[in-house]
């Protein structure tokens, strides 16, 4: 098992996206929103170990360095690994269209 630990940085855009997802849910179910917030942060923190375990965002075109981490139930953290740092760029709801990320 790879013992290397990576530094995980969350972009302002990803933070805004996460806040929007949690805030939207909080309007109807504050407890579920808090669970979502915790789940998102746990998933993102897990990238400190073996971030390469996750698939590429676009498996057909690996020229793009972006990878995706599925965070139950419906979210994806989109990130790139550069040296010993993981840069989380986006947090998207996988039920919605996110093909614009592939362009």
List each model region and its residues.
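Arg/Lys-rich, positively charged N-terminal/basic patches that mediate binding to nucleic acids
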Residues: 1-39
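Residue-level recognition of specific faces of alpha-helices
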Residues: 17, 21-24, 43-46, 68, ...
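Hydrophobic pocket/interface hotspot
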Residues: 14, 40, 47, 88
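Basic/aromatic recognition patch in beta-strand/loop cores that engages polyanionic ligands
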Residues: 52-84
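Short, charged, surface-exposed hinge/linker loops at domain edges
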Residues: 39, 46, 62-65
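Enriched for short, Lys/Arg-rich terminal
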Residues: 1, 71, 75-103
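Short, hydrophobic secondary-structure boundary micro-motifs
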Residues: 34-35, 55-58, 100
């Amino acid at each position: 098992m790879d013992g290397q630990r990576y530094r995980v940085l969350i972009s302002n855009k990803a933070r805004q996206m996460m806040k929007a997802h949690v805030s939207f849910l909080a309007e109807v179910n504050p407890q579920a929103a808090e669970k979502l917030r915790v789940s998102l942060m746990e998933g993102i923190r897990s990238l400190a170990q073996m971030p390469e375990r996750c698939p590429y965002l676009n498996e057909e075109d690996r020229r793009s360095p972006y990878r995706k981490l599925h965070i139950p139930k419906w979210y994806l953290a989109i990130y790139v690994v550069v040296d010993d740092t993981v840069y989380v760029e986006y947090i998207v709801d996988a039920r919605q269209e996110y093909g614009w990320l592939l362009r």
